[in-house]
Amino acid sequence: MDIRRLTDRLGGLAFGGDYSPEQWDAEVWKQDDELMRRARVNLATVGVFSWALMEPEEGRYDFGWLDAHLDRLHAAGVAVDLATPTASPPPWFTLAHPDALPVGRDGTGLTHGSRDTYCLTAPAYRRAARRIAAALAERYGDHPALALWHVHNEYVTLCWCDHTAAAFRVWLRARHGSLDALNEAWGTAFWSQRYTSWEQVLPPRTSQWHRNPGQALDYSRFWSDEALAAYREQRDAIRAHSDRPVTTNLMMPGYQNLDLWALGREVDVVSVNHYPDAPGVDAAAHAAYDADRARSFAGGAPWLLMESGTNTVYAGDRTLAKEPGDVLRHSLAHIARGSEGALFFQWRQSRAGAETWHSAMVPHAGPDSRTFREVTATGEAVARLGELAGSTVRAEVAVLHDSAAWWAMNVDGLPSSELDYPTALRRAHRALWDAGRTVDFAHPEHDLSRYRVVIAPALFLLTDAGAENLRRYVADGGTLLVQHFTGIVDEHLHARLGGYPAAPLREALGIRVEEHRPLRQSERIALTDGSTATSWSESLRTEGAETVAAYTHGMLTGSPALTRHGFGSGHGWYLSTRLDDAAYAVLVGRLLTEAGVTPDLPGLPAGVEVVTRHAPDGRSWQLLINHGSEAAPLPQPAHDLLTDAPLSRLPAGGCAVLRAL
């Protein structure tokens, strides 16, 4: 695996961050060398936003300043993750190529003065990006400091310009083959939308009312493919001159412009940016959710936390500060779930510019600060964990995750505004995290045989192949929980006829949904098992399944709300409403118990997070984080790698890494 090349080069796990020496003078650079040694920094990301310096005018490159910094970092024992600067074109580029500026859905054109001011489909942009990637690789491909290539930064920008329209049409021709096929897929017989020439076809720009759902979904697919193509062009330009591994950073959690399963197959190292959006235990659960997603997109292989925050991060209308100890806790939370280190944005907090108040490893207050002391302590901790490099995480439970299903639930006109795919994903993961079980994410068409329990939350779009795969999983002995609004449409967003969900899945579940009945926003309904539910209900009938709980509400009184069906060697559960959190936790706990899924370290109190990493040679390590307010006794004393001492109680807020005997 290519990430092992990185950790071998570093001599252990990675620790460091995004480094922008061009923002500072020579005196600060000298301080940086010393402070990086103190913090045990061994990897610095360089060049992310440096296009204007690297190429001050079109076709003329100036790498002298970069030579000096890479040489200096190498002399200081710091390896480099060298970025292509293509996420932020310089002003000269947009003036020379105004057609490369992005255009919003409503037709508003943007200009330079910020970042991400480009259209991925603009030929001039793509040429310039390839050229600078090739120039960097030719110059630094075998530089002794170079450990990793970092293509671009956060592929999140969208565009609806004329270049995009032309590229979209090319993509649609390749996907559908003919206008007749496109018209059928998009259902253009409705609202008189039938296309009679390709020139009539546009991206889903702002229009009078709802966008065509098939058009919107295909645009999401197209844009993901376009971003992947842009990444591959730079990656291939680099590989022509360098054999070092290549990555690009996936933006977590809410950005879903890319099919992250597809991107995971294209990079040598899966790397992610993660900034928890809530304090306390919610932030810890959020970190686990994104770390488990990253590992899953890496195919279960080790991956890398490329960016996180040491302290304040932007959260809506304010910056929120982390609590003491969070730098270590959040770093270890990602390492526990497969990351081969912890890096931050950025090394030194900017004194000017748009992200002046974004936290950094060295804050405005300097090294004599709580933040830098925590950074140094975290660097020391990470340095002690080198033996974990190359180890992996195993899970017996999976939550199904499909980018197409996510995009499908963003289309206009769904039956309820409360239907939200990422919320459903996070809720399922949170229940499993609270129960102390390690979780993978899996695609509905993946091989699911290694999982004892699989949860399918809100898979609105489900292909025939996916439905058949889930049917087979249950028949072969798996426990499957399917939640409401799953299997409703096919890959074209065509509604399933004859009852929901898709026919193969109905067979495994032993039910047939006839009607959706969204609830009013403040409405709560009771079920016969004493639980309550909100948001959604369905009229369904059993076709072999047993009713576990029924509705006690209106016309659905007595109708099944939660069912269980023995099918083949397994069991298919169906939940037709949104249970309250406590009842949902009970349901998930029952599934885990019946399937024999146990915690990694039984006997610990609630609030102690435990994940096990396994080495190919049979060694294993248990990483513990106590999110509770009281010390937690361990089931038996163990040796803690962080303190190099025996440990019998984990303090409140404390962390430990135990080497299994």
Where do the language-model regions lie?
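Short, well-ordered coil/turn segments that N-cap beta-strands
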Residues: 10-15, 40-42, 74-80, 142-147, ...
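Conserved, mostly hydrophobic/aromatic
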Residues: 17, 36, 44, 73, ...
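Short, acidic/polar
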Residues: 23-38, 129-135, 251-263, 323-331
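Aromatic-lined substrate-binding rim segments of carbohydrate-active enzymes
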Residues: 30-38, 42-109, 137, 233-241, ...
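Carbohydrate-binding surfaces of carbohydrate-active enzymes
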Residues: 201, 275-661
